[in-house]
């Protein structure tokens, strides 16, 4: 029986997309997948339809390493509407309460301080977290509220940008699992007036360079240019991709000689020099430092394979 043919190109890398407002992260993902004609694609942490900004999209083998970006810290710019609380904690929801805005500058500064550092956060019912196998927002849309446990998060930096009338603008540098909508909702309750998000932009993810972000419009323009020039679209699109191992760029690198890497790629732990004492590592092979997967240092100090790059035939 013949092996089923994979649909699309074997293209591997990470595209830093500047997500437009009003589209779901999955809709954007599918558009990018079609533009690149990629056989596989996945994003690394959804943005709400209201939100814009950096959405790393992994293509091909890079999807295996997207989990490491989910664990990375992120930075956001957010504008909140004070005096109104909504059921979703953002402007897409229904207003459930309106109160006057009467706090002082000192009270605002004091309230903001309580959200800095290591804190606990109860996720919104309008989130993709699951309860008994079902997403929270699915319960919320049915008018059902289920118990949620507070989760530890870290807010590394919470910058006050401006407060004008009923608008408050902040910049937030936070750990994985942080819901900006929940921070704004909780802040509004602490200030006694209620609040919801009207604008949210993800500025950075991990250490990815902001100047490498591209829009859907730019991708579509490149496809049109390629057609006009009579060249494959891939010739203009592929240089936009970050390396497939970039989601794991925070991990140390272990380079294996070719004599050892063959065993590693076959699923065997191997001994090496210069490896850290424990933890995950990026594994490369040979003098050209070709990335071959993620490994973990075992109890005997060997590098054991955890996620391997599959080398497809041309």
Swiss-Prot record:
One of its GO terms (biological process) is mRNA pseudouridine synthesis. Its EC number is 5.4.99.25. GO terms for molecular function: pseudouridine synthase activity; RNA binding; tRNA pseudouridine(55) synthase activity. Keywords: Isomerase, tRNA processing. InterPro entries: PsdUridine_synth_cat_dom_sf, PsdUridine_synth_N, PUA-like_sf, PUA_sf, tRNA_psdUridine_synth_TruB, tRNA_sdUridine_synth_fam1_C, TruB_C. It comes from the Bacteria. Pfam families: TruB-C_2 (PF09157), TruB_C_2 (PF16198), TruB_N (PF01509). Substrate binds at residues 43, 76, 179, 200. It catalyses: uridine(55) in tRNA = pseudouridine(55) in tRNA. The active site is at residue 48. Responsible for synthesis of pseudouridine from uracil-55 in the psi GC loop of transfer RNAs. HAMAP family: TruB_bact. Belongs to the pseudouridine synthase TruB family. Type 1 subfamily. This is tRNA pseudouridine synthase B. It comes from Salmonella typhimurium (strain LT2 / SGSC1412 / ATCC 700720).
């Amino acid at each position: 029986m013949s092996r089923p043919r994979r649909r699309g190109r074997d293209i591997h890398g990470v595209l830093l997309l500047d997500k437009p407002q009003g589209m779901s992260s999955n809709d954007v993902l599918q558009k990018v997948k079609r533009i690149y004609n990629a056989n596989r694609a996945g994003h690394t942490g959804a943005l709400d339809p209201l939100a814009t900004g950096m959405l790393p999209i992994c293509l091909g083998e890079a999807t295996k390493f997207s989990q490491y970006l989910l664990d990375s810290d992120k930075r956001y710019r957010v504008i909140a509407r004070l005096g109104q609380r909504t059921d979703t904690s953002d402007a897409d929801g229904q207003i459930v309460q309106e109160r006057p805005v009467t706090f002082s500058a000192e009270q605002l500064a004091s309230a903001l301080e309580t959200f800095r550092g290591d804190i606990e956060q109860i996720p919104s019912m309008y989130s993709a977290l699951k309860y008994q196998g079902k997403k929270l927002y699915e319960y919320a849309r049915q008018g059902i509220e289920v118990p949620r446990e507070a989760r530890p998060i870290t807010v590394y930096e919470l910058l006050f940008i401006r407060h004008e009338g009923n608008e408050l603008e902040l910049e937030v540098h936070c750990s994985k699992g942080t819901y900006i909508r929940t921070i704004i909702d909780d802040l509004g309750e602490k200030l006694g007036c209620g609040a919801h998000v009207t604008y949210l932009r993800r500025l950075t993810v991990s250490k990815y360079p902001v100047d490498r972000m591209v829009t859907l419009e730019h991708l579509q323009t490149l496809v049109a240019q390629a057609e006009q020039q009579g060249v494959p679209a891939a010739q203009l699109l592929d240089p936009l991709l970050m390396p497939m191992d970039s989601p794991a760029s925070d991990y140390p690198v272990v380079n294996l000689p070719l004599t050892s890497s063959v065993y590693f790629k076959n699923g065997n732990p191997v001994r090496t020099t210069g490896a850290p004492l424990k933890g995950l590592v990026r594994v490369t092979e040979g003098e050209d430092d070709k990335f071959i997967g993620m490994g973990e240092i075992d109890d005997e100090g060997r590098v054991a394979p955890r996620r391997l790059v599959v080398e497809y035939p041309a």
